[in-house]
Amino acid sequence: MWLYLLALVGLWNLLRLFRERKVVSHLQDKYVFITGCDSGFGNLLARQLDRRGMRVLAACLTEKGAEQLRSKTSDRLETVILDVTKTESIVAATQWVKERVGNRGLWGLVNNAGISVPMGPNEWMRKKDFASVLDVNLLGVIEVTLNMLPLVRKARGRVVNIASTMGRMSLLGGGYCISKYGVEAFSDSLRRELTYFGVKVAIIEPGGFKTNVTNMERLSDNLKKLWDQATEEVKEIYGEKFRDSYMKAMESLVNMCSGDLSLVTDCMEHALTSCHPRTRYSAGWDAKFFYLPMSYLPTFLSDAVIYWGSVKPARAL
């Protein structure tokens, strides 16, 4: 019986592999709009798709980032300045895209722009600390998508949203994990709604990678600011030893991050170019063999693992 099951699983994987390798035709005529192209995943994906001959519309936060990207790509790639927290910026970028794609519509929308800080123990934060991250990582994704959807629907195209393994398993306080859970939920509802119009929605769930999101200097400065703004009662309960150990633990996690960003951008590219993209892509060995399996464990077991491996506050019971 087990041999039959193994054979069935093997056959299914072969069929899936064959199915997923079928590529969309006329890629050179397809327009893809990508947010967050100054650096990291967005920057690499823009260059990757440009090399493949696609029409890349890259949104950068800064003119400097846009100039650097243009210097490394062909004349096909065009850039626009976009702040995903500002409605007027999103509306202007949408009009800019509309003028370029015309009646063909927008084949791909990649919501990649994101930030990680403020990030740390929840009790060290204020409402504005959560809001600043949610404004970029979740509300920015939603507003950009709502504005671009008519163009994507016209092309019967793709929406690719960058979530995280932290959208499956919340390890850190602050708005980051909350925002990524929100991206997962938004993408799920969007996928079910847009299937009637031939639009496919894919979610990318990277593990740890070396980008601006995991920049240790930025994370360290953020943690110091959060500690400084915490109340005296909170400081006494957690203690300076906890603060220092927490920072070291975060540094250890950052040091384990992969530098091979193509593991993520290859997933993004597949979601845009395959005739049969996946619903979810897990990128990185830590995602596949730690975070995702952990997310499937009963809650009491995953809580126990995290409790065993975490730093304890000074007044912990």
Swiss-Prot record:
Keyword NADP: yes
CDD domains: type2_17beta_HSD-like_SDR_c
UniProt enzyme class: oxidoreductase
InterPro entries to which the protein is assigned, alphabetical: NAD(P)-bd_dom_sf, Sc_DH/Rdtase_CS, SDR_fam
Pfam families: adh_short
GO MF entries: all-trans-retinol dehydrogenase (NAD+) activity
Residues the entry annotates as binding substrate: 164
Keyword vocabulary terms for this entry: Endoplasmic reticulum, Microsome, NAD, NADP, Oxidoreductase
Catalytic residues as annotated in Swiss-Prot or TrEMBL: 176 (proton acceptor)
GO BP terms in the entry: retinol metabolic process; steroid metabolic process
Gene Ontology terms: cellular component: endoplasmic reticulum; intracellular membrane-bounded organelle
Recorded catalytic activity of this chain's protein: all-trans-retinol--[retinol-binding protein] + NAD(+) = all-trans-retinal--[retinol-binding protein] + NADH + H(+)
Family: Belongs to the short-chain dehydrogenases/reductases (SDR) family.
Stated name of the protein: Retinol dehydrogenase 7
Organism, as annotated: Rattus norvegicus
Primary gene name: Rdh7
